[in-house]
Structures are given as structure tokens and as C-alpha cells.
């Protein structure tokens, strides 16, 4: 049974004199610096002091900057929610968290209700926030788990199925690309993404070589019979072999080689932005949003699924369509791609 709490009067929720407290600061940088330290009994060891900074760097690399910023915002939002209701976010209280996520799903004020994935993301942020403060949030506690299960059952919606891009669709999409530097890059993105069954974040995270950049998600090796892409995943490293195609027009390895040659890329991110005049490649890594936009635009230009409205095509096709296309073509479960 979820413990009932007395809410603060409504006027308190909009009282501008109530300033943020110490829990609401975006202190992700401070927490990252202070997470790893030496025991007091070993203080003063120069060798271990150097290792502390190395360990801190690895700790910071455990999550991307954008993820850490999102988690910090999640914590600040929860801390403010607590303050406006006369509660303290510390120590971790499953009862309080249960009430918080219930309010996110069915807010009493003007704030919009959050979707189930957004609420789950908030919980991940709070779990991180408590861990950085030396506390632990048990998401399996019944006060949280039962409320979340009810939210999923009442408000959850099945994920929209994305349309798979089949080989014949891909050929039509490739035919719409211009014969310039951007076209070479985008052709390589589509072919490598399809042949490797890669997620859009994996495509743009690849570097030319191992350890080229700190934010690398992997690297590529081009060989005589194909290419080998090594990717960093949530559970470790995995290798993706990409064979050469039967013709240059559809060969992902040839497309990648052409892009690297004309873009003069021999170090750093594999797929980068092109200058405004379209004549040279920059050093700026592409966002994964570029892959989604590229797919939507080439699908539209190729006239795929003409019986659908433009809005429906935009909704059905996304970065996931490349991965789904390989799974459909190979007749395998997408989980094993």
C-alpha cells in the first residue's frame, strides 16, 4: 500500500519567493569529480593520486555528456517537486517516488502527462542521482513497481512499427542522391547501415581507426574481401562483417571507400558534415538525427508507398527502417541482427 502524503497548499506551487534549494543545482560535473577518491589512510600517494584522475575519467565515460545532463535535469525536477510539497528528496523513499511517478502520469495542474517511456527515463535519472549521492533507489520496491505497472497498463501504448526498407527500396532511394560530396557520404551511410543492420547512433559513432576520438563508438577496417566494423555496445564490443557487393553501385565497401577518398578522411569520425559550399568535409561528427532525416527525405524523393500521405510516410520510415530491412531480407529475428 502506498503511503499517503499531505500535499502543500496550491498557492505554494506557484510562489515565486520559494527559490531553488541545494538539491536542485545541476551539479553533474561536481558529482563526476567527487565520485572517485582515495581513502583517507592512503592520502598523499602521488602514484595513487594519478590513478584517481584516471579512474574519474573512466567514470565520466560511463555515460555520454547528453545522458548525464538529462539525468541531472531529472534530479533537479524531482528535487523541485519535493520542495513544493514540503518533502525532502534524501534519503531515497520508494513511497515518495511512487507518488512522484503517479503525478507525472496524471498531473493535477497544467503540466502535460508524461508518456511511459519518459517516466521510465525519469526513474533512470533518479537512480543515477541517488547513486551519485551515495544512496540507492530500489526500483523493484512495491511502492514503485506496482505504481509503474499500473501506469504501463493504463497509459502504455504499443510501439509504432517502423516500415522495413527492402533492397529494391534502397536502390530507389540511392538513385535520388546527388553526385557530389554529400551524395557520396549519404550513399555510404545508407549502404553501410543497411548491410550491417546498424542503429543510427552506431553509424555516426564509427571512427576511421581505433581510439581516434574520446567519444568513439567503434572503428572500421577495410580489407580486400570486405569491411570489419567493431562497435561498442551496452554489453561490450561486437564485430560486424560487411561483404563487398556484386557491383560498385550497390557495394557498401566501395561506397565507403569512395567517401573516404574524396572527403580526404584518414582520422577521426567516419561520417562528418560537409562545408556549406559542398566542396570539403569538416571534422564535425554527424548527429544520429541526420540518418533519420536522410531516410525520410530519400523515401519521400523515391516515392515509396505512394498510397500513403506524406505524414504517414514520415511516421512509418525512420532510422530503424534500415535495421528492420536487413532483418526482413535475411528472414531473421531483428534481435539477432
Label each PLM-derived region with a short phrase.
Residues 1-336:
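Extended, non-catalytic subsegments within catalytic or DNA/protein-binding/adaptor domains
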Amino acid at each position: 500500500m502506498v503511503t499517503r502524503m499531505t500535499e502543500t497548499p496550491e498557492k505554494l506551487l506557484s510562489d515565486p519567493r520559494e527559490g531553488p534549494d541545494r538539491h536542485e543545482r545541476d551539479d553533474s560535473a561536481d558529482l563526476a569529480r567527487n565520485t572517485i577518491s582515495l581513502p583517507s589512510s592512503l592520502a598523499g600517494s602521488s602514484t595513487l593520486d594519478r590513478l584517481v584522475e584516471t579512474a574519474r575519467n573512466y567514470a565520466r565515460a560511463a555515460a555520454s555528456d547528453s545522458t548525464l545532463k538529462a539525468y541531472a535535469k531529472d534530479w533537479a525536477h524531482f528535487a523541485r517537486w519535493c520542495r513544493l510539497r514540503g518533502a525532502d528528496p534524501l534519503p531515497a523513499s520508494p513511497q515518495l517516488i511512487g507518488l512522484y511517478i503517479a503525478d507525472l502520469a496524471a498531473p493535477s495542474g497544467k503540466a502535460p502527462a508524461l508518456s511511459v517511456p519518459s517516466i521510465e527515463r525519469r526513474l533512470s535519472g533518479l537512480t543515477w542521482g541517488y547513486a551519485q549521492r551515495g544512496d540507492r533507489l530500489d526500483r523493484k520496491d512495491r511502492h514503485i513497481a506496482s505504481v509503474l505497472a499500473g501506469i504501463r497498463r493504463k497509459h502504455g501504448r504499443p510501439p509504432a512499427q517502423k516500415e522495413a526498407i527492402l533492397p529494391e527500396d534502397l536502390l530507389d532511394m540511392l538513385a535520388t542522391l546527388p553526385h557530389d560530396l554529400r551524395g557520396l557520404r549519404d550513399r555510404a551511410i545508407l549502404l553501410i547501415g543497411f548491410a550491417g543492420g546498424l542503429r543510427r547512433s552506431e553509424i555516426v559513432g564509427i571512427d576511421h581507426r581505433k581510439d581516434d576520438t574520446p567519444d568513439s563508438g567503434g572503428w572500421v577496417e577495410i580489407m580486400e574481401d570486405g569491411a570489419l566494423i567493431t562497435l561498442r555496445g551496452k554489453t561490450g564490443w561486437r564485430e560486424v562483417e560487411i561483404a563487398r557487393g556484386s557491383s560498385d553501385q550497390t557495394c557498401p565497401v566501395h561506397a565507403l571507400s569512395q567517401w573516404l577518398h574524396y572527403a580526404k578522411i584518414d582520422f577521426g569520425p567516419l561520417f562528418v558534415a560537409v562545408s556549406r559550399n559542398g566542396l570539403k568535409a569538416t571534422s564535425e561528427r554527424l548527429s544520429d538525427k541526420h540518418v533519420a532525416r536522410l531516410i525520410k527525405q530519400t523515401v519521400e524523393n523515391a516515392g515509396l508507398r505512394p498510397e500513403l500521405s506524406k505524414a504517414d510516410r514520415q511516421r512509418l520510415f525512420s532510422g530503424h527502417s534500415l535495421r528492420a530491412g536487413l532483418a526482413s531480407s535475411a528472414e531473421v529475428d531483428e534481435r539477432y541482427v
